[in-house]
Amino acid sequence: MPSCGACTCGAAAARLITSSLASAQRGISGGRIHMSVLGRLGTFEAQILRRAPLRSFTETPAYFASKDGISKDGSGDGNKKSASEGSSKKSGSGNSGKGGNQLRCPKCGDLCTHVETFVSSTRFVKCEKCHHFFVVLSEADSKKSIIKEPESAAEAVKLAFQQKPPPPPKKIYNYLDKYVVGQSFAKKVLSVAVYNHYKRIYNNIPANLRQQAEVEKQTSLTPRELEIRRREDEYRFTKLLQIAGISPHGNALGASMQQQVNQQIPQEKRGGEVLDSSHDDIKLEKSNILLLGPTGSGKTLLAQTLAKCLDVPFAICDCTTLTQAGYVGEDIESVIAKLLQDANYNVEKAQQGIVFLDEVDKIGSVPGIHQLRDVGGEGVQQGLLKLLEGTIVNVPEKNSRKLRGETVQVDTTNILFVASGAFNGLDRIISRRKNEKYLGFGTPSNLGKGRRAAAAADLANRSGESNTHQDIEEKDRLLRHVEARDLIEFGMIPEFVGRLPVVVPLHSLDEKTLVQILTEPRNAVIPQYQALFSMDKCELNVTEDALKAIARLALERKTGARGLRSIMEKLLLEPMFEVPNSDIVCVEVDKEVVEGKKEPGYIRAPTKESSEEEYDSGVEEEGWPRQADAANS
């Protein structure tokens, strides 16, 4: 690979700083530091001069050296001084002559020997001739070869800037419609939000890059291409430090290199330059979303389905496990860590992702415990404030130990956050604000504030005698009038609610929608059970009346679509027990089976009687001995 003198990625750091034995005796105060890494796929050498630019380094490829002196590239010149003589992670039999590849010094070509340490297996080797030490890279490190870095850097940045045009909202809506039944308003909001997120990524290019493009007209580079080049340099610099085992922000060497890279990047206008500027660029800001609705209405399913069709990283995080910093539980930074993991630890790609915060209503504060520290409620909301608005989060690096403190900085300014929660009892709070009675079952004016009081009131008013359809319609009507003060009374702090400007209420599922959920969408409930029975060569037939009866049972349980699977498991328990290894070829379920008036019907295949098969299976039916005696006589 050619020298990197034309880029701004800085110098590459190596895993082991080596020098000659004479230089080691004089100390490292000389005018030159020599660093070498011996890898399975190649050898990377970097020379850093005291007063030379840090970015001036060279790279020498290396190949395997076989026993007969012929290199893997087929040159076969056998020159010991050639840097293309091989290296591998394992030396095989070494000097014993039993075959296998041998480690050779990339400087002089002489054989290297393992350094004896107190550890049984060492990765360090030494050249006896030129007294150089090398470290043998592992399989994981060899996969991150320096030779492949420019290609991976270009791919990582072009994913964000040179992708195909973002899908229109209608196309995203149609895709969600294949898997999620109903919730048309929520689908439209999510589709538009994702589309605008794509546009914000593609258009929020710093203004200084446009000015730089005007200055560098001879390069004929567009602002987007300049941004790609800059991010390629940053990406390559970060990956070189990771391969060398050095954090970009963890020591003096990495810090100095990062400072040099930052100095070469044009900064935004500040101070007097802003006052004198006559042109202001429009920067698109994000609009975080809050989905609220009853349990089983499809909030999490919408997020899971949306994650499949996106070209940006998408992470789903459960807020119930989050705690304030310093307490047992998952830290708030783990939200961004999951997004970084989904982006394959590409920081630039993760900074343009989408985070789905599930069960966000569970971190609501609980009134009445002010003498205690609410580490799982209000404390988590306070920790999420800057995360939602946009800040730099320190996330632990990949394969880094906690004690070492190596972190990666991720900017959350362009990360879109979508929160969701059931908010049980929120309709009671809205009803109290509107001074309305709730279906004639008393007034909640004497109830306390907070999510616990609201949930208790909602549970107390659940009665089997109430009209289920009327109850659902009333709740949906109230949720459509939700305001920020209702969420604050529920237990969310005002600062948290203000950072979620788009509030989307999801409606409850009625009987017709539940019947559609059973059969229509891809990966529906009934086709899943039909696939289970087909593995035992059996069919499952469910009548239309049975589907409606199942939907009515789910409505009475008030658990939404999740109640459908519970009902189906109870109905099909006996058939799933009887069908395997039997002659049943069809199971029929009708309305009476759902209502518990009779058992499921079975259709059996015609049997072929054979005395030999009965004898082999050990089955003795009544009258079988007499038939056998008659046959023998």
UniProtKB/Swiss-Prot annotation:
Region of interest (Disordered), ranges: 68-100, 598-633
Enzyme class (EC, first level): hydrolase
GO cellular component: endopeptidase Clp complex; mitochondrial matrix; mitochondrial nucleoid
Gene Ontology molecular function: ATP binding; ATP hydrolysis activity; ATP-dependent protein folding chaperone; protein dimerization activity; unfolded protein binding; zinc ion binding
Domain ClpX-type ZB: 93-146
Alphabetic keyword roster: Acetylation, ATP-binding, Chaperone, Hydrolase, Metal-binding, Mitochondrion, Mitochondrion nucleoid, Nucleotide-binding, Phosphoprotein, Transit peptide, Zinc
Annotated positions binding Zn(2+): C105, C108, C127, C130
Transit peptide: 1-56
Bias (Low complexity) ranges: 84-93
GO biological process: proteolysis involved in protein catabolic process
Residue ranges, compositional bias (Basic and acidic residues): 69-83, 598-610
Compositional bias (Acidic residues): 611-622
Keyword field contains Transmembrane: no
Function: ATP-dependent chaperone that functions as an unfoldase. As part of the ClpXP protease complex, it recognizes specific protein substrates, unfolds them using energy derived from ATP hydrolysis, and then translocates them to the proteolytic subunit (CLPP) of the ClpXP complex for degradation. Thanks to its chaperone activity, it also functions in the incorporation of the pyridoxal phosphate cofactor into 5-aminolevulinate synthase, thereby activating 5-aminolevulinate (ALA) synthesis, the first step in heme biosynthesis.
Family: Belongs to the ClpX chaperone family.
Full protein name: ATP-dependent clpX-like chaperone, mitochondrial
Organism: Pongo abelii
